[in-house]
């Protein structure tokens, strides 16, 4: 079984800006620069034959390159159950279309439908026992985040492996947009 997801990495300049915001919350496990990405679809653990089917379907996706920018920050969870902080994406129809294509590819490969609504974001930190005051202050300090636009010309099929400081991601297959 291999744990897989479709995503695209961020340009270094965008990741570097985000890394400067990764402070101010005790109990936060800030994601390393090289792990920052935008997930298009999480597939979960798959046997190798299903992963091959998924790769075939993802490689058939056709789409054009598009510009994207970060906009705003938020949290997953509520109150004392907040478990992650993230940077959001400016509304972008080509991004949403690419995510829908990844969902259709998953269905054609025999995977179950994703029941959660797609919310494009970059996870910046996972939280454990973080102060709600600190989290609230961090959101207020960073809520006007707006990055320069950047070009998305590819995405990939990534695997996730347990690591000493959280999951380690490895690009298994790259896919180009034209």
Give the ranges of each region predicted by the language model.
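Histidine-dependent nucleotide/RNA phosphoesterase domain, centered on the 2H-phosphoesterase fold
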Residues: 1-178
């Amino acid at each position: 079984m291999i744990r897989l997801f479709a995503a695209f990495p961020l340009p270094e300049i965008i990741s570097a800006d985000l890394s400067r915001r990764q402070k101010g919350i005790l109990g936060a496990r800030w994601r390393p620069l090289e792990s920052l990405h935008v997930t298009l679809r999480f597939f979960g653990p798959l046997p190798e034959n299903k992963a091959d089917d998924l790769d075939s379907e993802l490689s058939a996706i056709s789409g054009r390159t598009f510009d994207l920018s970060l906009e705003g920050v938020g949290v997953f969870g509520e109150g004392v159950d907040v478990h992650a902080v993230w940077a959001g994406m400016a509304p972008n129809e080509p991004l949403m279309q690419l995510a829908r294509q990844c969902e259709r590819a998953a269905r054609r490969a025999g995977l179950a439908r994703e029941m959660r609504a797609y919310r494009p974001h970059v996870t910046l930190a996972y939280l454990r026992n973080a102060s709600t005051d600190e989290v609230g202050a961090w959101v207020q300090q960073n809520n006007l985040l707006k990055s320069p636009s950047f070009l998305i010309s590819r995405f990939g099929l990534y695997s996730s492996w347990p690591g000493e400081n959280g999951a380690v991601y490895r690009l298994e297959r790259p896919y180009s947009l034209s």
